[in-house]
Amino acid sequence: MPDQISVSEFVAETHEDYKAPTASSFTTRTAQCRNTVAAIEEALDVDRMVLYKMKKSVKAINISGLAHVENEEQYTQALEKFGGNCVCRDDPDLGSAFLKFSVFTKELTALFKNLIQNMNNIISFPLDSLLKGDLKGVKGDLKKPFDKAWKDYETKITKIEKEKKEHAKLHGMIRTEISGAEIAEEMEKERRFFQLQMCEYLLKVNEIKVKKGVDLLQNLIKYFHAQCNFFQDGLKAVESLKPSIETLSTDLHTIKQAQDEERRQLIQLRDILKSALQVEQKESRRDSQLRQSTAYSLHQPQGNKEHGTERNGNLYKKSDGIRKVWQKRKCSVKNGFLTISHGTANRPPAKLNLLTCQVKTNPEEKKCFDLISHDRTYHFQAEDEQECQIWMSVLQNSKEEALNNAFKGDDNTGENNIVQELTKEIISEVQRMTGNDVCCDCGAPDPTWLSTNLGILTCIECSGIHRELGVHYSRMQSLTLDVLGTSELLLAKNIGNAGFNEIMECCLPSEDPVKPNPGSDMIARKDYITAKYMERRYARKKHADTAAKLHSLCEAVKTRDIFGLLQAYADGVDLTEKIPLANGHEPDETALHLAVRSVDRTSLHIVDFLVQNSGNLDKQTGKGSTALHYCCLTDNAECLKLLLRGKASIEIANESGETPLDIAKRLKHEHCEELLTQALSGRFNSHVHVEYEWRLLHEDLDESDDDVDEKLQPSPNRREDRPVSFYQLGSSQFQSNAVSLARDTANLTKDKQRGFGPSILQNETYGAILSGSPPSSQSIPPSTTSAPPLPPRNVGKDPLTTTPPPPVAKTSGTLEAMNQPSKSSQPGTSQSKPPPLPPQPPSRLPQKKPASGTDKPTPLTNKGQPRGPEASGPLSNAMALQPPAPMPRKSQATKSKPKRVKALYNCVADNPDELTFSEGDVIIVDGEEDQEWWIGHIDGEPSRKGAFPVSFVHFIAD
């Protein structure tokens, strides 16, 4: 800030200069004087704008107040007139009451009018005079005289300095500076004029300060007293009316009783008269129905079925304008909708849902008919009467067809029906999850409102508070009222109220319970929900510094740990920050980039959490790639759906100038291209279905008693963790959505068979094996049932088993090659087979870190299905798909060891010493490794031998 001079300093310096010009230092303070004037001008300009807005507001209050007074006066006049009418009509008690309220309102109106006038006189007039007087004009007008004096002073001093320097130069000397004392006498006139203008300016500023400060506050004090008088006088008027109001209440009760008695007598008389005229009314009603045959009927007349339900052609439509002209329009009827084209081609056609319309004939014109929609009536005219009848029949037939489809459903929409059934099953299981039987916030029973971005259920009262927080905190949907897509249930299936509150309510104070109950009011709910979700006041905090938070976020995404991710969210980590991943695919990746490039069928909910709770879905890597670019590079349509639902930008280009759509077209990823095209045209449905391993719990209703006795059933409390069965395909052909959906709901469409159908397909979305080579000779055919979880096995204790080396990580990212437009592609190129994968640890839980190193990058290539939700590292394109990582299983009581057993499920060996077999294979038991694993070989194939899990077979009686 430049140096300035205060008023007291200016006065002292000017006095000193006036007494001793040659000894004064005023010449050195002139620049400070100018800085002071400039600063004062800035402040005055700001004050001028604020005072102008204040004046404008006061004026608006005055205008609206006078309008209010006028309306009050009209209301008073109406009360007075109505009371007078009551007095004249033998209702003196009611009339006097209305007149009292008229007088009371008139008194309050007069007081309010006086208050408005006082505000105008006390505040508005002084402000107006100040703005039109001292503060009139624009910025800089007030200091113009000062600026002129400054300019004259500077011109004179520059001229004198130049003359002094030239004089010294003539005498052979060089002068760089001229002291103030040397030119004090020559500059006295200009200096005095400068001081005078500065003094005048400060005087004006002082006056303005008084008027906009002290004087304005004095006026506000006067207005305060006027307000006090208004409220005191109003209170006196209220107190004077109180006794009359109390008496009036008693009188009104008496009058009401008398009127009720009159009403009772009239009702009795009406009933007597009705019973006498009952027969005549029935006959009259029958005649009326005959006369009103052309009126509206709930059941519309049936159309001629010969004309069908679809039609295209031209009709004349009467315009809505003043002229009411007939305009020729192209019309089409199809699938329960009437489409009416406009006269101009660039306008989209109007589309009417016939279920909300009514077709009526026009009695005046035989070739005209009316279509009554919910908001207007369309008048149509056909070429002739026969054409009119055809159009009306088609409209009625199409409406009837749409109505039947709405009530009965369409048998041809198998995929949609499967999605609906799957959604219902998911919602049912979500409601059965631990803690989901009560509201997550207040404990009210049977919550039906879902926060899709947090995966919790709340009651309707708490859901209203969630909506007030905004969608960046909680996105509420109704499980019963809204039509949900499976994508909106991902987090609900994986989090739930119990797991969420274990983190977000970990630090609730026990001595002072703050959590609301079902009977709490909305204020208590709002205070608690705001503290819980916005401030995260009660959440468990594990990390304080930013580096530790980002590291925990990175680990949660790598290990596919949803509760670890929720913990990072509770710690307050920025989900869009660059994560500390030294060996990422591209520099400056975010957690969303990492989640997208390492996603599989079991970890889509990790991506969904990041998509819904990140403030920015368009963060770019060092090479300009967004998460959408990653999806299109790997043909990851499921993640693409989640990002498009979250409104991620599809226009951003990477460093190569390619948008996600450009990449999808170049790599011929048709599904991604179709989704992006839908988003560009605004046709993308946010309630979208996604392919995901839901692992629903279903009852085996159709099993025989023999099957139940014969099988070794897995423990019921472990069914949630059971891995799904799978099968391999010999080619890289993509599977249709209907197949994928049927896989997810196999138990719904196949008489509630056990578990799922095949659940791991060669779909690029989840890392397809794109090798063109056929499967191995021991590839497993599809299984109709799901296998129970594999028991833990310590393979290291077998002396014949050697631990295989770890898999070789790919160092050359396939994505770099995909980023560059290639001249030719050879999908059938053979690849060397890496060493087999390491064995699974003896026991692993879902949320614990995996034993294998998770710091290795997961290449953004079309990869095989990972071994489980926690597994990481790429799989070779030549290797068989592995099932998800099995969960440890409690040992069950087994029968005496037989010699021969039969396989219940398909099983693919994870280790070289294990046996691969298919459902129905007979296995000869050679020995027992432990209680859960036996040794044996396939009957008739002694070369196929190894360890197998007991829970995958059943006994064959000798």
Curated annotation (Swiss-Prot):
Residues 833-844 have a biased composition (Pro residues). SUPFAM superfamilies: Ankyrin repeat, ArfGap/RecO-like zinc finger, BAR/IMD domain-like, PH domain-like, SH3-domain. ANK repeats lie at residues 587-619, 623-655. Its main location: cytoplasm. It is found in: Cytoplasm; Golgi apparatus, Golgi stack membrane; Cell membrane. Residues 424-546 form the Arf-GAP domain. Residues 768-787 have a biased composition (Low complexity). Residues 290-303, 811-829 have a biased composition (Polar residues). The modification Phosphoserine is found at S704. GO terms for cellular component: Golgi cisterna membrane; plasma membrane. Binds PXN, ARF1, ARF5, ARF6, PTK2B and SRC. This is Arf-GAP with SH3 domain, ANK repeat and PH domain-containing protein 2. It comes from Mus musculus.
